[in-house]
Amino acid sequence: MENKLIELIETYNDFPRKGIEFKDVLGIIQEPKIFKELILKMSSSQIIRNAEAIISIDARGFIFGSAISLEASKPMIVARKPGKLPGELSKKKYSLEYGENSLSIQKKCLQKYNSYAIVDDLLATGGTVSCVSKLLESNGKEVLGLLVVVELMKLKGRFKLKFPVESSITF
């Protein structure tokens, strides 16, 4: 399956900024059989099985997190960029490979569950995932691990995290 996935991921040089090699995973969802195979694989992870809930990261993480949530019968909450969520929020700023941003989680969503699997499309520097884990931990929650479709190994994001990382493809 790995070779099939690699063929479906397109690289865009100098996007969104000069010097960045953007890996576009959206080709995967255009191939339902491969997408399903990927979701079945990710859903069977011990990290997913042991977590009470899934937290997906804005925006492409929602695609994979939603599908995994359905397949694994796990609730899903979202970590969103500024101005996208109503209500009382838990917020944190983070650094990206190409800038700075912040993420928010609705506090009421965090009340029901104590252990989480983080799902995103890609792991680069680890800044986004680290932000989500710190948000969860600051609310007394446990992060069991991270599942991503793509991991950019040269950026060493996994080494900044204190929990297991499972990636379907590495570049």
From Swiss-Prot:
Identify the main location: cytoplasm
The record's function comment reads: Catalyzes a salvage reaction resulting in the formation of AMP, that is energically less costly than de novo synthesis.
Q: Does the keyword Glycosyltransferase apply?
A: yes
In alphabetical order, the GO MF annotations are: adenine binding; adenine phosphoribosyltransferase activity; AMP binding
Q: Where in the cell is it found?
A: Cytoplasm
Recorded catalytic reaction(s): these are: AMP + diphosphate = 5-phospho-alpha-D-ribose 1-diphosphate + adenine
**What's its EC?**
2.4.2.7
Pfam families from the xrefs?
Answer: Pribosyltran (PF00156)
Q: Keyword Disulfide bond, does the record have it? A: no
Q: Which NCBIfam families match?
A: PRK02304.1-5
Might you name a Gene Ontology BP term for this protein?
A: AMP salvage
As for family, the record states: Belongs to the purine/pyrimidine phosphoribosyltransferase family.
Gene3D superfamilies reported in the protein's UniProt record: 3.40.50.2020
Q: Which UniProt keywords apply?
A: Cytoplasm, Glycosyltransferase, Purine salvage, Transferase
Q: How does it assemble?
A: Homodimer.
Give the enzyme class.
Answer: transferase
One Gene Ontology cellular component: cytoplasm
Q: Which InterPro entries match?
A: Ade_phspho_trans, PRibTrfase_dom, PRTase-like, UPRTase/APRTase
Name this protein carries in UniProt: Adenine phosphoribosyltransferase
* Pathway the protein takes part in: Purine metabolism; AMP biosynthesis via salvage pathway; AMP from adenine: step 1/1
